Amino acid sequence: MTILSADTLSITRPYSNSLSTLKVIATPVTESPPSPVASSISPNATNLVEEFINAHKELQSYKSGRPVVLDGHTLSIAAVAAAARYDAGVELDDSPLVKDRLLQSRQVVADKVEQGTSIYGVTTGFGGSADTRTDQPILLGNALMQMQHSGILPSSSKPLDALPLQDPFGLAMPESWVRGAMLIRMNSLIRGHSGVRWELIEKMNDLLRANITPVVPLRGSISASGDLQPLSYVAGALYGNPSIRVFDGERTSALGPRKIVSSVEALEAHSISPISLACKEHLGILNGTAFSASVAALALHDAVHLTLLTQVLTAMGAEALAGTRGNFDPFIHAVARPHPGQIETADVIWNLLEGSKFATTEEEEMTIDEDKGHLRQDRYPLRTSPQFIGPQVEDLIASLATITLECNSTTDNPLVDGETGKVHNGGNFQAMAVTNAMEKTRLSLHHLGKLVFSQCAELINPTMNRGLPPSLAATDPSLNYHAKGIDIASAAYVAELGYLANPVSTHIQSAEMHNQAINSMALVSGRATITSLEVLSLLISSYLYAICQALDLRALQHELYEGLDAIVKEEIIAAFSPFLDDYEITRFTAISCHIVRDAMDSTSTMDAKDRMTSVAASLTTPLVDFLTGEAFSDVVSAGQALTTIPAFRARIAARGYELLDELRRAYLSGGRGLAPASRFLNKTRPVYEFVRLTLGIKMHGAENYNDFENGVGVDDVTTGQNVSLIHEAIRDGKLQPIIVDLF
C-alpha cells in the first residue's frame, strides 16, 4: 500500500478570487512501491463555473445576432438553447467538403436503388416487418409516414363541452423542444451518413427561419429506433401533409399556444414550397434521437444554472444562518479529500463568503466555558454541502459531455459510407446514452433539492436558525406566520422531486413484434427531467425569497443587539454606579450583554413585550450572584443594590421593546432603504439586491405591523406572487447574468 508523505503534497493552484480549481499532486514515499490504486486516483478537475460562463457568453452572442452554424461536428448545448428558445438564426455550413460528403452518400443510395440492391427501409419493410420487399421506395416512405402519424393531439381549439382535467394542449410538445429537435436532426443529417439531399436540410431550415413549428405529440416515443413518431410530424410538415398542423404567427401571450394551422396553409403563407421526399429520406428524417437529445440538451442547459445557483444560495444561507466560512477551507477539500466536484464546490462557496459580515470568516479558539451551550459546528446542510453537491457536479459534467456528443452524432439506420459505398446496418438510434445522462441528472436535481430544502427548513425553524424569529416573521410571531407556507410548500416540492428521481429505464417494455425488445425511453426520461427542473426551480425560488427575508432580519438583529448592549450598559451605570466601581461596572456589563444576547436567541418565539420582559428577567440571577458575591462585604450596600433590581429590569424591558418596535418600523417602512442587509454582504450582495431592487420584492411584514388595517393583500402582494417573480427570473434567464458576474 502506498503511503503519502505530508511534505510531498503540493497544491498547484490555490483558491483564488477567480474560483480556480485545486489540483493536489501526491508523491508516494519511496520506501514502498507505487500502488496501482494510488496511481489511478487522479480524477480530472471539474470546472462547472467555466462551463456556465462560456455557455452564457455563447448564448448572448446568438441572442445578439450571431447565427448558429451547423456542420455536423460543433453544435453546442448553448446553440441548441439559442435556436430552440430564443429564435436564433441558423445557417448551414455549405462548404464543398460538407456538400460533397452529402452528395456522395446520396449517390450511393440512388445507385443501389437503381441497381435493385436490397436496402433496409428503402426496399424492405420496417422493424419486425423487414422480411417484406418492394421496388417502390417512395410509396414505402409514404407508408412509413402513415404508420407513424399515430400520435394523440387535441383535434380542435374550439370550446369543449366539459372542462378538461388537464390542459388539452398539454398533449403537444412545447415549441422549444420541437425547434431543438429540428436543429439537431439537421446537424445529424448534414454529416453525410444518411443518404439525404442537401435540399432536404435546407427545407428544414426554412421552417425554422419562418418560425413554423410542427405540432408534435408529447407521448408515443420509446426512443429505440429513434424518436420515430415525433420526427414523423416534422417530416409531414416538410412535405405539406394537410393533416399535420403547425404553430404559426406571432406570439401574443406567455399563456397558451400560437395560432394552429395546417402545414399546407403555413407553407403557403410563408411562400415555402413543400418538398417531395426522395427514397431513404422518409426514414432518414425519422430514424434518430433528435427529440431525446433536444430535451436533454435544454434540460442540461438549465441544470447547470440551478446547480451553481444552489452553491450560491448555500453561501447566502451560511450568511443568513450565521454559519462559518471554515466549512469550505481548502485543506478539508483540496488536500484531505480531493474529489474534483467537492473541490470546485467548496472553492465557489469559500470565495463567495469572503468579506461577509454575517458569516464567521475567521474562527477563534475558545475555552470550554466560553462556548458552553453553543453548537460547536454548523449542521450538515451547510457543513457538508461541498461533499453533497460535489458528486452532482461530476455527474452533470459527464452528462454535458454525453449530450454534446449526441448532438454531433449520426443517429440513423442504415448508415451510408459515401467514400466506400458501403451501407451499414446498426443501431445508432438506440438512445440509452441520453437516458443514462437524464437519469443521472434527474437524481442529482433531487439531491440538490434535498439540500436546499434542508437549509430552508433550518432557516425557518427558530430552534435552529440562531436567533431569527419563527417563520422569519418580522413582527410578533403570534400574528405572523410568514414563511410557514413556504416551509410546507417546500416539503411538497422536494417530495415530488424524490418521486421524479426514480429511473424511467427500469420500466422499458418490449415493442414492435418483439423486434424492439430493448429500448431506451430517453424522451420520457428527458421529459421527467424537465419536470424536475421546474419543481427544483420552485424550491430554489422559495429558498432565495426566504434567504433575503432572513438577511434583512439578521441586519435588524445586528442593530438590535448593538442597541441592547448600549441600553444594558446605560442602565447598569444608572442603577448600580453608587454600589460598584468602574472595573466592576465594566465586568458586569460584559457579562450582562452576553446573557441578554443568549436570552434574545432563546426567546425569538415570543411577542415583543413578553420577550423583552423575559430577557430582562434573565439578568436577575446573575445580578443577585454578583451583588452578593465577594465585591460586597457591606451587607447594607448589597441590600440597597438588590432593591434596585425590579426597576432595573423594568427599564431594560421597556427600552428594549421600544428599540425593537422602532427597528421593525424602520425596516418595514423603507427607513433603512429597500435593501437594508446590503451593507453586511460582500460577494453575494448582487443576488440579494437583484431580488430587493431589480425585482422590487420588499421585506415582508408591513401588513402585520399595521394590524392589517387595510385588509389582506392591499399593502403588499402575496408571498406566492413574490416567489413567482423570482421563479420567472430563473426560468427566463434574467438571473443568469447576475450569477455569471459573481465569478
Swiss-Prot record:
Gene Ontology molecular functions: phenylalanine ammonia-lyase activity
Alphabetical GO biological process terms: cinnamic acid biosynthetic process; L-phenylalanine catabolic process
Listed CDD domains: PAL-HAL (cd00332)
Post-translational changes noted in the entry: Contains an active site 4-methylidene-imidazol-5-one (MIO), which is formed autocatalytically by cyclization and dehydration of residues Ala-Ser-Gly.
Sites of the 5-imidazolinone (Ala-Gly) crosslink: 224-226
Signal sequence bounds: none
Enzyme class name: lyase
Induction info: Induced by thermal stress.
Keywords: Cytoplasm, Lyase, Phenylalanine catabolism, Phenylpropanoid metabolism
Mutant phenotype after disruption: RNAi-mediated knockdown results in delayed primordium formation.
Annotated compartments: Cytoplasm
Keyword ATP-binding tagged: no
Residues at the catalytic site: 120
Positions carrying 2,3-didehydroalanine (Ser): 225
Catalytic reactions of this protein: L-phenylalanine = (E)-cinnamate + NH4(+)
EC number: 4.3.1.24
Quaternary data: Homotetramer.
Family: Belongs to the PAL/histidase family.
PANTHER family reported for this sequence: HISTIDINE AMMONIA-LYASE
The protein, known as: Phenylalanine ammonia-lyase 1
